[in-house]
């Protein structure tokens, strides 16, 4: 083999290798461009500050996947690859913010849940963000609304008032979740404006929070889950004061394995002389809760405070229903929902930590939160203190 032939072979091989390198670099560049394009279309949520307490970040990362798996199990949904977006905040139109942090939980590319980290107990409300203890809760709160605009290159601010929750984008305000307040008529959204103070504070933020997938932590484990076997959500509370009626109906339907109970019939039984027009304004008092339970063959008793995890576990195994009695921390005397009732559905152990599963009659799905938290951060941005329980339904 002469030297000129060797030289030609070497040149051909060199050309092939250079061509392959160019192609691979091109593919890498295209892949990066695709990723960049994908991220450029990600939803961004405006925040005053992108600083999140480290304990909040750690709790969210440690627990989100286990919570999502547990809630998926309750709705018989298949598990998937769970990822956590970045934290965002919710503001009033005047710029005030609440004391909670919200994370979108993403499964297989879709926002399916919202992870909420809020003060654990009433005493924590007076502590700084860095010093307070946080409770972790998961629900479907505004998750579907966020998912609908996740890939539309949107930049929004999440806002709230007594009417509900809103997305503001390019100066336009859109109601996405109405609160169950009597006479809650949807106002013209165009009339709502964000305060100049909040606009400036949001503008000063270095970067908005991005609703994008982060690397999932897959070792989260749901070691145990125990719920009332026949519990189903059949109705939802709207513009009325029947929270206890809804909760009692749901618990009795579950423990008796029937579908004969509903909130309206229970309230009509308790208030036979009240007109249909005035019935939505009727509330339920503790003695009525006990007497109605007894009329249905149940031995109901009141217990102060939050029942222990072990007690909830045993009562649920025994097919005994527990109703939560809670009071709004704000103590506004004009609040039609100053008191609230919810139904305990069961308990779970996630990553060796004890959790309670409950149903808020305002919601269409269940929620899960820490078993040692007496503070309930409910679906229209208010904190309720769990002060007692009615046991025996």
Curated annotation (Swiss-Prot):
UniProt propeptide residues: 37-219
- Kindly list the places in or outside the cell where this protein is found, as annotated in its UniProt entry: Secreted
Instruction: List the GO terms this entry assigns under cellular component, sorted alphabetically.
Output: extracellular region
Residues forming the catalytic site: 243, 340, 360
For this UniProt record, the keywords arranged alphabetically read as follows: Hydrolase, Protease, Secreted, Signal, Thiol protease, Virulence, Zymogen
UniProt PTM comment: Proteolytically cleaved by staphylococcal serine protease (SspA).
- PROSITE patterns, A to Z: THIOL_PROTEASE_HIS (PS00639)
**What EC number(s) does the entry state?**
3.4.22.-
InterPro entries assigned: Cystatin_sf, Papain-like_cys_pep_sf, Pept_his_AS, Peptidase_C47, Staphopain_pro, Staphopain_pro_sf
Q: Which residues form the signal peptide?
A: 1-36
Q: What is this protein for, i.e. what is its function?
A: Cysteine protease that plays an important role in the inhibition of host innate immune response. Degrades host elastin, fibrogen, fibronectin and kininogen. Blocks phagocytosis of opsonised S.aureus by neutrophils and monocytes by inducing their death in a proteolytic activity-dependent manner. Decreases surface expression of the 'don't eat me' signal CD31 on neutrophils. Cleaves host galectin-3/LGALS3, thereby inhibiting the neutrophil-activating ability of the lectin.
Q: What else is known?
A: The cascade of activation of extracellular proteases proceeds from the metalloprotease aureolysin (aur), through SspA to SspB.
Q: Which family does it belong to?
A: Belongs to the peptidase C47 family.
Write the protein's name: Staphopain B
UniProt source species: Staphylococcus aureus (strain MSSA476)
């Amino acid at each position: 083999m002469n030297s000129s032939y060797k030289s030609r072979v070497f040149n051909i091989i060199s050309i092939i290798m250079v061509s392959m390198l160019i192609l691979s670099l091109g593919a890498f560049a295209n892949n990066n461009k695709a990723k960049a394009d994908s991220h450029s279309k990600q939803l961004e949520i405006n925040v005053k500050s992108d600083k999140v307490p480290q304990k909040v970040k750690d709790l969210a990362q440690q627990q989100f996947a286990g919570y999502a798996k547990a809630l998926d199990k309750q709705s018989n949904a298949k598990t998937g690859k769970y990822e956590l977006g970045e934290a965002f905040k919710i503001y009033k139109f005047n710029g005030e913010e609440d004391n909670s942090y919200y994370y979108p939980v993403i499964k297989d590319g879709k926002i399916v849940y919202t992870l909420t980290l809020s003060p654990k107990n009433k005493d924590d409300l007076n502590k700084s963000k860095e010093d307070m203890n946080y409770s972790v809760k998961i629900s479907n709160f505004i998750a579907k609304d966020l998912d609908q605009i996740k890939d539309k290159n949107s930049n929004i601010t999440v806002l709230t008032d007594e009417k509900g929750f809103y997305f503001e984008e390019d100066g336009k305000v859109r109601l996405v979740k109405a609160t169950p307040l009597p006479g809650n008529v949807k106002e013209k959204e165009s009339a709502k404006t964000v305060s100049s103070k909040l606009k400036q504070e949001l503008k000063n933020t270095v970067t908005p929070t991005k609703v994008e997938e982060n690397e999932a932590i897959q070792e989260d484990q749901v070691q145990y889950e125990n719920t009332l076997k026949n519990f189903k959500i059949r109705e939802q509370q709207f513009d009325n004061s029947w929270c206890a009626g809804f909760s009692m109906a749901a618990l009795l339907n579950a423990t008796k394995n029937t579908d004969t109970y509903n909130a309206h019939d229970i309230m009509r039984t308790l208030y036979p002389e009240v007109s249909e027009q005035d019935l939505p304004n009727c509330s339920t008092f503790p003695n009525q809760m006990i007497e109605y339970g007894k009329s249905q063959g149940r031995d109901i008793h009141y217990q102060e405070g939050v029942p222990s995890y072990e007690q909830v576990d045993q009562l649920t195994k025994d097919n005994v229903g527990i109703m939560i009695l809670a009071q709004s921390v704000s103590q506004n005397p004009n609040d039609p929902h100053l008191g609230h009732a919810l139904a305990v559905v069961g308990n779970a152990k996630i990553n060796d930590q004890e959790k309670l599963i409950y149903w808020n009659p305002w919601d269409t799905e269940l929620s899960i939160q820490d078993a040692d938290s007496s503070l309930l951060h409910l679906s229209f941005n208010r904190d309720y203190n769990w002060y007692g329980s009615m046991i025996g339904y």
